[in-house]
Every structure is written in structure tokens, then in C-alpha cells.
């Protein structure tokens, strides 16, 4: 069930391959044991596939959640706008430099403020990842979708997963830990069993990818393809081997 680094010379291929693998495994275990996840809002009713057992995660694996209401995020956004103008402007500058911005300056400011606010809350609660209820209560409060903000958090090594998918956030953390933080995880946010193939599943990406996974320049469109709100991001992801995808969230 496991492998080990056999007795070998330091200059041997076996040692060169085995030692990095050992370090990566240690990093995965360390990350798993030190995970706390910020949960913004409750699970949407229809998303039964993302139910998790919070008590079991804590008792068996010491993985804890830090639930916060959406209103707390709204208050943090106000603080960011009033007290952290430099951080806010730095995020705005990033979007203006690295994306094709098609939304208004006001909406772009809100996208940037949401990113900083979520980052602040993760720091305050000691969280290394987050999950969020993406719609529609958030739009009622701040008028934007969170995807462009979340993609930037992903880019900076703070995984955020949609619709409070706690297991998805844990998966991202472990994948990135296995690469020692050199690569960003790509997570298919909605996965459902195939209706005919018992050994198959349907992957539909409804979450967020890091900007570094983009093959084309990301676009911040005026509206989402489903919801009439700004705050989404669209780009074609880099093709790796047999897998490729197009993000439009």
C-alpha cells in the first residue's frame, strides 16, 4: 500500500526521485492536519452533492470550518473601501493590466473589494481555504457575482470553491500541497453520476480557475451567461495532455 526510498546513493536516480516524493507526501499530510475553511453563507438547497459532515471532519481529521454570514462579508467590504485603499487599488490595477475589463469602474471596484474582504476574513479566522454561496443572496447585497474575485484568490494560493463545497476545497488544498505550491489546482465544481454509465461521471465546471491557467486573456464581461450580473470571468484554459476546458463563470 505504500512505497519507500530504498538504500541508495545520493546521486542515484532512485534517491533523486524518491526524496522529492517523500517531501511532497509530508506536505500533503501537514496541510491536511492544519486545514481550516472559511464558509461564507449556507449551502444552497438544491446542491445536495456538496453536503458534508462538519462534526466528522473535526473529530476524525481536525479539519474545522469557520462559518460567517454574507452580511459579515458586506461589512468587511465597507471596511476595505474605507480603510484599505492601497490594497483595493492594487487589485484594481491587476485586473486592468491582466484582463479585458468590460464592466464599469464601480463594479470593478466591488470585484476588487470582495477579493480583499475574503482574504482579510481568511486571515482573521486563520483559514487556508474558503467556500462560498455564490448566488443569489450575495448579488442582492453587493450586486456582483464573486467569480473574478475568487479566481484571483485561487491565483494567489488561497483556494475558494463555489456553493460551499467543503470537500472540494480540501481536494484543492491537497493537490496544491502535492506540488509544493508550484501549481494551482483545477477543480470541476459540479460533478454528478452519469445517468447510464455506472462507472462514469459528468463534470461540469461551475467554479473558478486561477488566472495562470488561462490560454487566452481573461475577460470580465458585463453579465454572466445565466445571471444578469457582472463579476464573472471568461477564458479558455491551457490544454494539458488529453484534458482541456473553457471557463465561463
What are these regions, as identified by a protein language model?
Residues 105-108:
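Active-site helix-to-loop segments that bind/position phosphate- or nucleotide-bearing substrates
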Residues 56, 60, 110-119, 123-248:
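Anaerobic metallocofactor- and corrinoid-dependent redox/one-carbon enzyme cores
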Residues 2-7, 243-249:
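Short intrinsically disordered, low-complexity coil segments enriched in acidic
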Amino acid at each position: 500500500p505504500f512505497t519507500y526510498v530504498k538504500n541508495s546513493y545520493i546521486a542515484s536516480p532512485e534517491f533523486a526521485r524518491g526524496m522529492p516524493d517523500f517531501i511532497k507526501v509530508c506536505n500533503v499530510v501537514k496541510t491536511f492536519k492544519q486545514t481550516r475553511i472559511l464558509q461564507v453563507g449556507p449551502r444552497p438547497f438544491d446542491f445536495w452533492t456538496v453536503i458534508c459532515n462538519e462534526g466528522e471532519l473535526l473529530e476524525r481529521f481536525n479539519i474545522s470550518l469557520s462559518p460567517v454570514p454574507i452580511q459579515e462579508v458586506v461589512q468587511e467590504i465597507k471596511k476595505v473601501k474605507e480603510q484599505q485603499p492601497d490594497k483595493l487599488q492594487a487589485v484594481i490595477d491587476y485586473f486592468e493590466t491582466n484582463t479585458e475589463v468590460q464592466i464599469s469602474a464601480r463594479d470593478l471596484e466591488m470585484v476588487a473589494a470582495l477579493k480583499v474582504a475574503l482574504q482579510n476574513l481568511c486571515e482573521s479566522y486563520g483559514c487556508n481555504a474558503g467556500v462560498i454561496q455564490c448566488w443569489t443572496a450575495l448579488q442582492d447585497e453587493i450586486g456582483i457575482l464573486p467569480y473574478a474575485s475568487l479566481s484571483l484568490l485561487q491565483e494567489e494560493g488561497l483556494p475558494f470553491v463555489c456553493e460551499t463545497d467543503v470537500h472540494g476545497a480540501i481536494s484543492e488544498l491537497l493537490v496544491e500541497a502535492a506540488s509544493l505550491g508550484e501549481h494551482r489546482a483545477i477543480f470541476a465544481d459540479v460533478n454528478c453520476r452519469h445517468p447510464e454509465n455506472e462507472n462514469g461521471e459528468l463534470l461540469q465546471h461551475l467554479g473558478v480557475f486561477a488566472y495562470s491557467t488561462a490560454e487566452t486573456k481573461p475577460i470580465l464581461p458585463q453579465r454572466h451567461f445565466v445571471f444578469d450580473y457582472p463579476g464573472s470571468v471568461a477564458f479558455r484554459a491551457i490544454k494539458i495532455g488529453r484534458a482541456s476546458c473553457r471557463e465561463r463563470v
